Amino acid sequence: MESSSINRWFEYESGHAWCESAYKYQTLPYVAEFANTCTNLPIIVLPLVNIMLLRRYLHDVNGGLIFPQLLLTFNGLASTYYHATLNLFGQLVDELSLVWIITVFLVVYIPVMKWFPEKFSKRLTLVRWVVLIVTALVSGLCFLEPNLNAIALMLFSIPAAVVINYEGKQSGIPDIESFPSRILALWGVAFSFWFADRLLCDFWLYLGTPYLHALFHLLAGLAGYTIFIMFSMIDIESRTKTHKYTAAVRYFPGKNGSIFSFPYISLKERSQ
């Protein structure tokens, strides 16, 4: 009985299938949802690009910034596994890693967040442990009742959006003034694709285009990456008295900073 229960988590198609699953295994015989699998590549790669560009700052000043970004890469890998197999374990790890990204992000960046009450700064370690313990308890409950995961994500993501908007607008850094609007626009369109794929699948199948969840991956991945760029800039600026670096946001391709361009941080040593 116990073995059967464990096997249920790893069985092909034991998790939620998306609209593309109507064409499952047609592109590759061992990949259930090909487009949904491949579009995780930016989620895997972009955080590693930011880590590489900030490697000197991470080494010299604040190495903790690496953890939430590695978690985003892990989420991309988990999502790749989930959409390739559609098993329940992959689905839960994919979704729970998003909860942990938000948690670890908060733990790492909370010292430079303006909304965090200064009177609690002396109890920062306690606050961090409380956040981690609560998330661990929620994660355990989600394994017992997987449907709780969607509720946990909703409860975590709404205040996260408020914090992103507040911190970006209060940062006083010209390079990231437009980032809250940029992030929320990408996130809003991404989630509209997420809901449309789930609720209107028959319509997309009629049109022969069941790929809205794949577009969700691309836009949500870019939004998540942009969040890390914004808060990396805030961290660098907030600690400017403790290091020798200056940072500026650049864009690829071009320099106009359109919503579909990739922002990145140009890090240089301050001239003596």
Curated annotation (Swiss-Prot):
Family that this chain belongs to: Belongs to the alkaline ceramidase family.
Broad EC category: hydrolase
Signal peptide boundaries: none
Glycosylation sites: 256
PANTHER family, alphabetized: ALKALINE CERAMIDASE (PTHR46139:SF3)
Membrane-spanning intervals of the chain: 34-54, 61-81, 96-116, 124-144, 148-168, 183-203, 214-234
GO cellular component: Golgi membrane
InterPro entries: ACER
UniProt subcellular location: Membrane
Catalyzed chemical reaction(s): an N-acyl-sphingoid base + H2O = a sphingoid base + a fatty acid; an N-acylsphing-4-enine + H2O = sphing-4-enine + a fatty acid; an N-acyl-15-methylhexadecasphing-4-enine + H2O = 15-methylhexadecasphing-4-enine + a fatty acid
Sorted UniProt keywords: Glycoprotein, Hydrolase, Lipid metabolism, Membrane, Metal-binding, Transmembrane, Transmembrane helix, Zinc
Protein name per UniProt: Alkaline ceramidase
Major location (coarse): membrane
Pathway named in the protein's UniProt entry: Lipid metabolism; sphingolipid metabolism
Biological processes, Gene Ontology terms: ceramide catabolic process; sphingosine biosynthetic process
